[in-house]
């Protein structure tokens, strides 16, 4: 009796198993996916394909149809993965190449698209709509204006540090810059980016030297910046980028000169240079892009070593929704260590509007962002940034970008003797607005 019960249990389990997992072979999968594809039932194509792959059934038409199904559903990450598997089986089918090319483009994988299109015939390029120039080349011009939330916040400035302590304190008032950059593909695998920026900053400066105090309500600093980077597409999905950022800083410095029993203040024109170099590796997985960046810099007469870990997620397999984070560790030779966290959430709100929300926290003083492109080498400290970005593709050739950031600053009196403690800590807030035009060519 016991063996009979065990046999019945095994029979029920077997029936349940076969009911849940229909028996498939290459022929039945071919027939079912073809029928579903002809009727436009893309969900059924994907469902059947997943079941077949789970049972070890894999062939060209299956991957090809699954790629088409995901493509029509707007999941270009999954579409590119299946098209590429089909491409590895048969790389001579022109229509497959066309689908794979546009899946790469719509997924934002421009380098993969360039390398693939380099092997197209002229007839296939014309038929697939591949542009004569490599996709991703552009010229950009941007303008920025930064100003405090409370424009009178320096009116009540007081410093109780004894005059015997030499040092200075800066409070940022306005910041304006213009930036022009060009991105150019030199070959299917190699691209370069070069930009020049001119920046003007005004600060409230309080300085003490040899028992005298100097106040400059509109202290001016001017910067010229050159940024250069090159990106090499190593293998499918992987890019290696190296670059450098050079900053020339012009400002005035007062010093007290003794002449017998009397003295006078002499103003010197000073030119300093800040610089950094970086190396970055990025790899694109389906639905996830990862990046690691190492930055070595010398800013404000200090050496910095910075490491960035970046993760970006595309849950829909396209650019309609994405989010991610950048985790930064910054070490300075003065023994200072800082952790910075930046969060990003973006997506497509309208057919011609993408929006992004950005939140950053951590001491940004002497830190760099976005592969060394943005450098925070001001004398005060930004401790938090909350902002947004609006991206408006006006046409295939023109894109408008608008950025806004609400920033929290922290300023202290810095003694020249680094062994002394910083004093007179002040907190204030500012707005930063940037507008940019990008011409694609």
Where are these regions (language model features)?
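Strand-connecting loop/turn motifs
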Residues: 136-138, 185-189, 235-239, 283-289, ...
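Alpha-helical protein-protein interaction scaffolds
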Residues: 20-134
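Long amphipathic alpha-helical scaffold segments
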Residues: 107-143, 154-160, 164-167, 176, ...
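Surface-exposed strand-loop-strand hairpins of Gram-negative outer-membrane beta-barrel proteins
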Residues: 147-181, 202-209, 213-218
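Outer-membrane beta-barrel translocator/channel fold
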Residues: 169, 199-205, 217, 224, ...
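Transmembrane beta-strand segments that form the barrel wall of outer-membrane beta-barrel proteins
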Residues: 64, 139-147, 164-166, 192-198, ...
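Bacterial Sec-dependent N-terminal signal peptides
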Residues: 1-26
